[in-house]
Amino acid sequence: MRGLEKQGPSATAAPCGCAQPALETGNLLTEPIGYLESCFSAKIGTPRQPSICSQSRACLKIRKSIFNNPEHSLMGLEQFSHVWILFVFHKNGHLNYKAKVQPPRLNGAKTGVFSTRSPHRPNAIGLTLAKLEKVEGGAVYLSGIDMIHGTPVLDIKPYIADYDSPQNLEPQTKHHKLRAAGPSDATANSCDQQLLSGCEKAQPCHSTKEKPKCREHRTSDENSQKFRDTSEIQHTLPEDRERAVDLALESSREETMDEPEDQLGPQELKSFLEEGTDRPRKVEGALVLRGSSAETRWDASCHARTADRVPCSVVPSWVKEAPVATLQVRFTPHAEMDLRKLSSGGASQTSFKYFHSAEEAKCAIEAMLSADPRSVYRRKLCEDRLFFFTVDIAHVTCWFGDGFAEVLRIKLASEPVEVADPEESLVALGS
C-alpha cells in the first residue's frame, strides 16, 4: 500500500516508559573511557575549534574499569600523528536543543544545527581532531585541543588521511580503464553518477586503487631498470613486441619471478611471453591497448590530470569568510611582567603545567583572543565589560576594543574557575 515505509527495529520500552538500551535500535548507555586533563578549566575562553590554538595540551588516561591493562588498548597508536577524539559536551547545563542555532561565528544569524558544530544537539557529542604528542603506558598526550578539563571521552580513533580527508577527484574523461568488453562495463562505475554539492559538475567517486607514479617521482634506479628492459625488448619479434613491452613495464612490480627479466635470452623471453598471453593488461606506468599502435602512458599525462582535478570538499562562505573579524592582540607591560613572573616558578610558586615557557603561553593566549571567544551576547551588549578566562595556571583579564583585544593582567589561578551563570563573569569596566 502507498504510504507504508519499512520500519526499523522498535525499541523495547522499560516499565518507566523509557527505551531500554539496545544495540539494534541505537539506544546505548555510553561509558567514558577516560576523563580529560586539559589546560582549559572552563568553557569561557576555550577555543571553539581545535585548529585555533595549537599550543593547547591535554592528557587522557584510560580508566582501568574499561580495560584491566589500559596500555594494551593503546598499542600501535603511537605510530599515528593525529587522532579523533569523541567526547561529550558535559557542561551544556541542560539537554534542550533546537533545530536552528546561532553560532558565534555567524554573529547572530541562524542556521540549522546539523550545519554547525554547536554543542546543543540531540546527542551532545563532540568530535575533535587532535595531534598525538606521545603515548605513555595507559595515557595519551594531546595538543591542539578544544576540550575543557574533566571532559568525558567516549572513544579514540586514529586519523588516516587516505580515509578521512577528501581526495581530489578526476574528471570522468580522464579515467583510463582497460577491461574486457562485456555487460559489466555499463555498471562497473556506478559511483560516477554521484553529485558533489557545491561543485560545478558531477565528478566520479575517488578510487582507492593505487595510482601510478609520475615520471618525476620515480627513482633513478626505477628509470634505469625500465630503460634496460625496454631497450632489450626492441630485438624481439614484431608480433611479440606488444606483449614484451607490457611485460617489461610490469616486471618492476612482479615479485614472484625467479630471475630478473634482463637475464633472459631472446628465445627464453619469447617462450615466456607465449605462456603468459592471458596476463592482466593493467600495468604500472603505462597501458598498452590491443589492436592499436598507440600506447597510452599514464605518467605522460599525470601533470595535466592534476591541473584538471576539482576539489571535492566544499564549505559555505561564512566558514572561510566569517562576519566576525580576526582581532589583533596586545599585552600591557604589566601583563607581560606578570606572565614572566608566573613562568619563573620558584619554591613558593607553581610553574606552568601544560605550557613549556612563558612565550608559548603568550602565543596560546594570542591565538585564543584573536578568534574572539566572546558570545554574541557579550559582543553586542557587553562591549564595555572586562573579559577573563583561565588557561593552564594563568587567570587572564582583558578587554576588547574596535578590532583588537588587550590583555591587562595575568595572575595565578589558585583553583579552576568555573562560573555557572555567564553574567557572573562580567565586571564593569573601571570598577
UniProtKB/Swiss-Prot annotation:
This is tRNA (adenine(37)-N6)-methyltransferase. GO terms for molecular function: RNA binding; tRNA (L-threonylcarbamoyladenosine(37)-C2) methyltransferase activity. Belongs to the tRNA methyltransferase O family. S-adenosyl-L-methionine-dependent methyltransferase responsible for the addition of the methyl group in the formation of N6-methyl-N6-threonylcarbamoyladenosine at position 37 (m(6)t(6)A37) of the tRNA anticodon loop of tRNA(Ser)(GCU). The methyl group of m(6)t(6)A37 may improve the efficiency of the tRNA decoding ability. May bind to tRNA. The keyword Lipid biosynthesis does not apply. Residues 207-243 have a biased composition (Basic and acidic residues). Residues 30-168 form the TsaA-like domain. One of its GO terms (biological process) is tRNA methylation. It comes from the Eukaryota. Residues 167-189, 201-243 are annotated as: Disordered. It is an enzyme of class 2 (transferase). InterPro entries: TrmO-like_N, UPF0066_cons_site, YaeB-like, YaeB-like_sf, YaeB_N_sf. Gene3D superfamilies: YaeB-like. It catalyses: N(6)-L-threonylcarbamoyladenosine(37) in tRNA + S-adenosyl-L-methionine = N(6)-methyl,N(6)-L-threonylcarbamoyladenosine(37) in tRNA + S-adenosyl-L-homocysteine + H(+). It comes from Rattus norvegicus. PROSITE patterns: TSAA_1 (PS01318), TSAA_2 (PS51668). NCBIfam families: tRNA_TsaA. The keyword tRNA processing applies. S-adenosyl-L-methionine binds at P47, R48, Q49, H90, K91, R117, L127, I148, H149, G150, T151. Pfam families: TrmO_N. Transmembrane segments: none annotated. Keywords: Methyltransferase, RNA-binding, S-adenosyl-L-methionine, Transferase, tRNA processing. Its EC number is 2.1.1.-.
